[in-house]
From Swiss-Prot:
PANTHER family: TRANSCRIPTIONAL REGULATOR MRAZ. It comes from Acidovorax ebreus (strain TPSY) (Diaphorobacter sp. (strain TPSY)). The lineage of its organism: Bacteria, Pseudomonadati, Pseudomonadota, Betaproteobacteria, Burkholderiales. Coiled coil: none annotated. Keywords: Cytoplasm, DNA-binding, Repeat, Transcription, Transcription regulation. GO terms for biological process: negative regulation of DNA-templated transcription initiation. The keyword Hydrolase does not apply. GO terms for molecular function: DNA-binding transcription factor activity; transcription cis-regulatory region binding. Forms oligomers. This is Transcriptional regulator MraZ. The gene is mraZ. It holds the Pfam family MraZ.
Length: 142
């Protein structure tokens, strides 16, 4: 399970360094094999390959009415591999789609990660914190 937020910098070639605390798990779980794709909220999803395969199967089974979402998730998916130093190359197309330039945030979301442009994430998080909490949390004990 992946959790927590990490501030990252993409280098000039569009590579990010996976935080050390996640490298061993990604190597053990997926041999360093990852899949990146678009997320409807404007970030990228980063899956260990076995989790991606499960997600891909679920998406592929959706009805024809979801064809465009299949295209968005599957058609934009890029398989990548961590190099020996834990770096991952994010394609120019996916960097552009998520508005990634240099400063980024990697969020552990359980079985996958979200990769956000830092400024975009901070703005969306601030807006969410100012908005009313969703009903699903009304009876949740903190």
């Amino acid at each position: 399970m992946f959790q927590g937020a990490s501030s990252l910098s993409l280098d000039a070639k569009g590579r990010l360094s996976v935080p050390t605390r996640h490298r061993d798990a990604l190597t053990a779980q997926a041999g360093g094999q990852l899949t990146l794709t678009k997320h409807p909220d404007g970030c990228l999803m980063v899956f260990p390959r076995p989790e991606w395969e499960k997600f891909r199967e679920r998406i592929a089974q959706l009805p024809m009415s979801a064809q465009w979402w299949k295209r968005i998730f599957l058609g934009n998916a890029m398989d990548v591999e961590m190099d020996g130093t834990g770096r991952v190359l994010v394609s120019p197309e996916l960097r552009e789609a998520a508005g990634l330039s240099k400063d980024a945030i990697l969020l552990g979301m359980g079985n996958h990660f979200e990769l956000w442009d830092k400024a975009t994430y901070e703005a969306k998080e601030a807006a969410a914190m100012q908005a009313e909490m969703p009903d699903v949390f009304k009876d949740f004990s903190f």
